[in-house]
């Protein structure tokens, strides 16, 4: 655990706009960044539970293909990469 002095230094850096917690981008203080990172982690885990491991993996493949010019689906189609969107369905 960080000492009180380290926490103060990290908080000061966060208030200057620096991201000091992985996943805490956008937080205006150390505490805010910690809460953002925790929420993002839980959100991803919940989505993975909803889709299942295979669906989550397929969605990541599709998202990883996207760029500024085209979506992941467009690029996959253009390059002949098969994305099985049937795996995207939430489990019931």
Swiss-Prot record:
GO terms for cellular component: cytosol; nucleus. Residues 1-16, 37-61, 72-92 have a biased composition (Basic and acidic residues). GO terms for biological process: response to abscisic acid. Keywords: Nucleus. Its main location: nucleus. It is found in: Nucleus. The keyword Metal-binding does not apply. This is Protein EMB-1. It comes from Daucus carota.
């Amino acid at each position: 655990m960080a000492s009180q002095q380290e926490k103060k230094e990290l908080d000061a850096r966060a208030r200057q706009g620096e991201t000091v917690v992985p996943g805490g981008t956008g937080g205006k203080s150390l505490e805010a960044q910690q809460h953002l990172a925790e929420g993002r982690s839980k959100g991803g885990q919940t989505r993975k539970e909803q889709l299942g491991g295979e669906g989550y993996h397929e969605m990541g493949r599709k998202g990883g293909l996207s760029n500024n010019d085209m979506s992941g689906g467009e690029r996959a189609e253009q390059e002949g990469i098969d994305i099985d969107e049937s795996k995207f369905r939430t489990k019931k």
